[in-house]
């Protein structure tokens, strides 16, 4: 049987790299073509694979149509994972819109330029951000829900527009897989002001990096049914990965041996609304088709993530709570991006993320933002 050719964008990013690794493990059946920016970091990362005949690296740019066309030409599958994501997307919103929408246009144009585009199956990676603010009691939803991005969220808008480009292009085989938050080792060490844009009372249904990579490989298998295509699906690692944002913060700090959120953050630092995240009524549909979940227990996965961090992160438990708090405080007050900077300097964002001055001033303790327990498995849904 002839090998299939898979073209993947964003292969040096978190999800893309996990997908590449899964495909590479199946290289007896797949030739893998990668479009990557020509940088020292990417050269170093891809060096071990450059001599492998099953891997072709195109050094280029998603915004250059000719580079995208080189990747698409002759491909059986196109996995469009690349684009700008947070935190870069938060700092450069206009560029994010331009790059994410422009790259989607280039991919579709390149597919349509093929002699028989109907033979190409294209996978677009969307985002849970497309649904916008879904705080309780409106925290359950599915892929048919309206897409209402949060205010100021150009990333979410770019994902909505890009998905529409694929859906309306007349392609015979397209699918949008809307990614949630990805649990990968580096997330335990990511520190930036956007952490405080996340309401503690909000929710998210997470996906592990391993499941996400396996998903990208599974979708390229011959046994995927025809009726899978031309739809949108939500990605998650299942009901056990449903967490409130407060619960996630607790798990993350605990994994590093750090004190609870109450001891290292002020409750006012966290926004009250205008983010994204929900729990899925249709969470299992995608796995029932593609069988990508490993069903690793949540606590075990957090322990695995910690084990993959550099050694010095394992010493985090030595830091006293007051020192951690002093380290984190500047991010809440960072000019332009910090929630506490908005309080005095950006009334539009302040209102969008807190609702009102009264709502902000009503936050007097963690009891005012700590969410009540939520039922994670609702049979009636």
Specify the residue positions occupied by each region the protein language model found.
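Conserved Rossmann-fold NAD(P)-dependent oxidoreductase catalytic core, especially the SDR/UDP-sugar
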Residues: 84, 102-152, 175
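Conserved beta-loop-beta element that borders a ligand/cofactor-binding pocket
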Residues: 160-186, 227
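Glycine-rich NAD(P)-binding loop of the Rossmann-fold in SDR/ketoreductase-type enzymes
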Residues: 63, 91, 95-106, 149, ...
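Conserved glycine-rich Rossmann-like NAD(P)H-binding loop of the short-chain dehydrogenase/reductase
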Residues: 28-41
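Mid/C-terminal beta-alpha module of Rossmann-like enzyme folds, strongest
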Residues: 221-291, 295-320, 327-381
């Amino acid at each position: 049987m002839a090998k299939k050719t898979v073209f993947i964008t964003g292969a040096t990013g978190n999800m893309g790299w996990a997908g590449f690794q899964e495909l590479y493990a199946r290289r007896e059946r797949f030739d893998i073509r990668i479009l990557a920016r020509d940088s020292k970091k990417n050269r170093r990362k891809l060096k071990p694979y450059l001599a492998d005949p099953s891997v072709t690296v195109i050094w280029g740019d998603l915004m250059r149509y000719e580079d995208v066309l080189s990747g698409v030409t002759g491909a059986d599958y196109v996995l469009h994972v690349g684009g700008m994501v947070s935190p870069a997307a938060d700092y450069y919103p206009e560029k994010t819109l331009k790059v994410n929408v422009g790259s989607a246009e280039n991919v579709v144009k390149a597919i349509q330029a093929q002699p028989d585009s109907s033979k190409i199956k294209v996978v677009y990676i969307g985002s849970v951000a497309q649904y916008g603010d879904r705080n309780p009691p409106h925290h359950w939803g599915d892929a048919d829900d309206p897409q209402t991005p949060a205010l100021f969220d150009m990333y979410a808008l770019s994902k909505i527009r890009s998905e529409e480009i694929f859906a309306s292009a007349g392609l015979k085989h397209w699918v949008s897989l809307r990614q949630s938050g990805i649990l990968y080792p580096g997330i335990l060490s990511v520190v930036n002001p956007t952490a405080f844009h996340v309401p503690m009372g909000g929710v998210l249904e997470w996906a592990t990096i391993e499941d996400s990579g396996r998903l990208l490989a599974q979708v390229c298998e011959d046994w995927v049914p025809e009726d899978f295509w031309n739809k949108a699906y939500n990605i998650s690692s299942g009901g056990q990965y449903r967490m409130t944002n407060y619960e996630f913060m607790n798990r993350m700090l605990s994994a590093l041996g750090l004190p609870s959120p109450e001891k290292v953050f002020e409750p006012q630092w966290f926004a009250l609304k205008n983010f994204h995240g929900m729990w899925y009524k249709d969470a299992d549909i995608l796995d029932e088709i593609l069988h990508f979940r490993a069903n690793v227990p949540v606590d075990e996965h957090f322990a695995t993530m910690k084990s993959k961090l550099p050694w010095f992160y394992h010493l985090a438990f030595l830091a006293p709570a007051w020192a951690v708090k002093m380290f984190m405080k500047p991010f809440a007050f960072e000019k332009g991006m910090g929630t506490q900077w908005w309080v005095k300097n950006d009334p539009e964002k302040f209102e969008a993320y807190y609702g009102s001055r009264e709502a902000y001033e009503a936050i007097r303790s963690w009891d005012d933002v700590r969410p009540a327990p939520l039922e994670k498995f609702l049979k009636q849904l």
